[in-house]
Amino acid sequence: MLFIGKTTEGFPVTVLQAVILGIVQGLAEFLPISSSAHLILVPWFLGWSPSGLAFDLALHVGTLIAVTIYFWRDLLNLAVEGLTKGMKTPTGRLAWGIVLGTVPGAIFGLLMEDVVEAVFRQSILTIALLLAVVGVILYLADRFGPKRRSLEEIRVSDVIWIGLAQALAVIPGVSRSGATITAGLALGLKRETAAKVSFLLGWPIILGGAVLVIPDADPAMFTPSFFAGVAAAAVSGYAVIAALLRYLQRGSYLVFAWYRGLVAAVTVALLLARGM
């Protein structure tokens, strides 16, 4: 999910719900399956009240912590080489690509927050359809993309294009990692390279969302549920990053494309069964 906004209300009722949603967030943020869709669908499946954008932010702070801890050396190298060597090295090019690629997502998120909250977050059917559609696109990109280029061969323009794809992730069901990984595969990046670029590109946009929201937050927002959700998302997110990067050394994204289709089908079936 791409989070930019200033909504500060809305929390699960119990710490247990917060932990469950934190684990869901940690799993779904880094897998191309849409964390925002799962944070809406899981409460809907279980009959809970919607958690709201404020709690979604709390969970994204958790996954931000996971990315920062896992990639702290990479983030430090990006900052140093980006400032000292500009675009003369692969790391420098990636750094400036991330800076430029973050802009579309930030602008789109700020402009579209109210529309997304009013339209997309309220429509379970729309979320299901987007899960399926992006799943098909991910399948095609993984199945037919060249997948030849490594991180050392990346261009600034590649990261900007991936950043444009990231802008679509403000819409639940699209998936920030799904959009960015799919774009990376379509541009010819190796599977593991596409994932790493996706994770690093997400760091500033999630940080920006936290910086915008937390200073204006109601102190009542910082409940035990908030901190339980953050911790659960951080721990599960770190584990998923490590596991996915190992898996992608030999595995593909096809399983996630099929999973998206399965979740979409189950969701539509439940909608029909409930007469909604």
Swiss-Prot record:
GO cellular component, one term: plasma membrane
Domain of life per record: Bacteria
Any GO MF annotation of the entry: undecaprenyl-diphosphatase activity
Keyword Transit peptide appears in the UniProt entry: no
Residues spanning the membrane: 13-33, 52-72, 96-116, 122-142, 154-174, 197-217, 225-245, 253-273
UniProt membrane topology term: Multi-pass membrane protein
Coiled coil: none
UniProt-listed InterPro entries: UppP (IPR003824)
EC code: 3.6.1.27
UniProt keyword Lyase, yes or no: no
Localisation per UniProt entry: Cell membrane
Principal subcellular localisation of the protein: membrane
Swiss-Prot/TrEMBL keywords: Antibiotic resistance, Cell membrane, Cell shape, Cell wall biogenesis/degradation, Hydrolase, Membrane, Peptidoglycan synthesis, Transmembrane, Transmembrane helix
Catalytic activity: di-trans,octa-cis-undecaprenyl diphosphate + H2O = di-trans,octa-cis-undecaprenyl phosphate + phosphate + H(+)
GO biological process, one term: cell wall organization
EC class: hydrolase
Task performed by this protein: Catalyzes the dephosphorylation of undecaprenyl diphosphate (UPP). Confers resistance to bacitracin.
Family the entry assigns: Belongs to the UppP family.
Other remarks on this protein: Bacitracin is thought to be involved in the inhibition of peptidoglycan synthesis by sequestering undecaprenyl diphosphate, thereby reducing the pool of lipid carrier available.
Protein name: Undecaprenyl-diphosphatase
